[in-house]
């Protein structure tokens, strides 16, 4: 008889754990919370701002990359499956350039209006895949927003590799809620 009570207690713990996870996921959806798993930005929980208004440099944004770019990220293992068109997850990045900004990619990083964002060009990613830099000498951004992995700029997959994104790709401005800074 005692074995039955032990199994019931163990099953009860699993039921409570599953209910807790379901409740946590429901609350995250209700309050527009996101969890970032990647080291590009601090790992942890973020919440989406209801009405971001005008996008500004320095804001953290959630972005569904253009389909072709996102599919490449999924294929290379940079992105997981998710809700964006093409079946990949949104990315969380810092916005470093907005329409009207002057952008130049150098060996050291991304130069925006003469401000350098450290992001050295790398030839191979951490999986040994060849990396292609976005071919930019110097451009003036028209309707493009440039993204930057501020937490781990050396290995982040950001606009230096695929260029800017349209406003329509930006899902919203998000802010950290409970995060920790971990780099690769």
Across the structure, where does each feature detected by a protein language model lie?
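Protein maturation boundaries and topogenic segments
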Residues: 1-90, 160-184
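Structural motif
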Residues: 45, 101-102, 109, 143-145, ...
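Short, flexible surface segments
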Residues: 56-60, 99, 141-142
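Catalytic phosphate/metal-binding cores of nucleic-acid and nucleotide-processing enzymes, i.e., regions
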Residues: 7-22, 110-120, 131-139
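Mid-length scaffold segments of soluble, non-membrane domains
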Residues: 86-119
């Amino acid at each position: 008889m005692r074995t039955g009570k032990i199994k019931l207690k163990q099953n009860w713990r699993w039921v409570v754990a599953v209910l807790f996870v379901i409740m946590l996921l429901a609350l995250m959806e209700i309050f527009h919370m996101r969890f970032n798993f990647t080291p590009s930005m601090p790992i942890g929980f973020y919440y989406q701002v209801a009405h971001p208004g005008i996008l500004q440099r320095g804001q953290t944004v959630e972005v569904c990359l253009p389909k072709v770019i996102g599919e490449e990220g999924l294929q290379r293992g940079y992105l997981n499956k998710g809700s964006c068109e093409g079946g990949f997850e949104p990315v969380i990045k810092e916005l470093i350039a907005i329409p009207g900004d002057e952008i130049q990619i150098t060996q050291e990083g991304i130069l925006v209006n003469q401000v350098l964002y450290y992001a050295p060009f790398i030839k191979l990613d951490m999986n040994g895949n060849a990396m292609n830099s976005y071919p930019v000498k110097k451009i003036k951004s028209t309707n493009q927003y440039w993204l930057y992995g501020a937490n781990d700029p050396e290995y982040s997959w950001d606009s230096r590799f695929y260029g800017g994104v349209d406003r329509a790709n930006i899902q919203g401005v998000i802010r950290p809620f409970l995060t920790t800074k971990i780099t690769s």
